[in-house]
Amino acid sequence: MVLPALPAPPVCDSQNECVGWLGVAYSAVVDVIRAAAHEGVYIEPEARGRLDALREWIYYNYYTERAKRRDRRRRSVCHARTWFCFRKYDYVRRSIWHDTTTNTISVVSAHSVQ
């Protein structure tokens, strides 16, 4: 697996903790993409599309919720968006892998994903 396993977001409706989790997830995705480019690892187009889509989802939610952090009425919305991003992150993390023999990052076939 390419992306690191992150702990689940906080169970409570704490906006600061949810925004913090989104920030960690965003930096993890960006670091994986940057490290692959730096080390010359080829990312197949389908895997690249999944990583880019995940990066954009987390980026949008992170900066939206960070900007609206002071509005206490958005607490449940922030919590729901964070859990959505966690499920999306976990799905992408399980669906791509790094083949060290060919030095590529590719998508795992659908029937081998658990």
Swiss-Prot record:
Single GO biological process annotation from the record: mRNA processing
Organism: Human adenovirus C serotype 2 (HAdV-2)
Protein name: Early 4 ORF4 protein
PTM info: May be phosphorylated by host SRC kinase.
Pfam families in alphabetical order: Adeno_E4
GO CC terms of this entry: host cell cytoplasm; host cell nucleus
Entry function: Plays a role in viral alternative pre-mRNA splicing. Activates dephosphorylation by protein phosphatase 2A of host SR proteins and converts their splicing properties. When expressed alone ex vivo, induces p53/TP53-independent apoptosis called cytoplasmic death. May mimic nutrient/growth signals to activate the host mTOR pathway.
Effect on the protein of changing Y62F: Partial loss of phosphorylation ex vivo
Keywords: Apoptosis, Early protein, Host cytoplasm, Host nucleus, Host-virus interaction, mRNA processing, mRNA splicing
Primary location: host cell
Segments carrying motif Nuclear localization signal: 66-75
InterPro entries: M_adenovirusE4 (IPR008680)
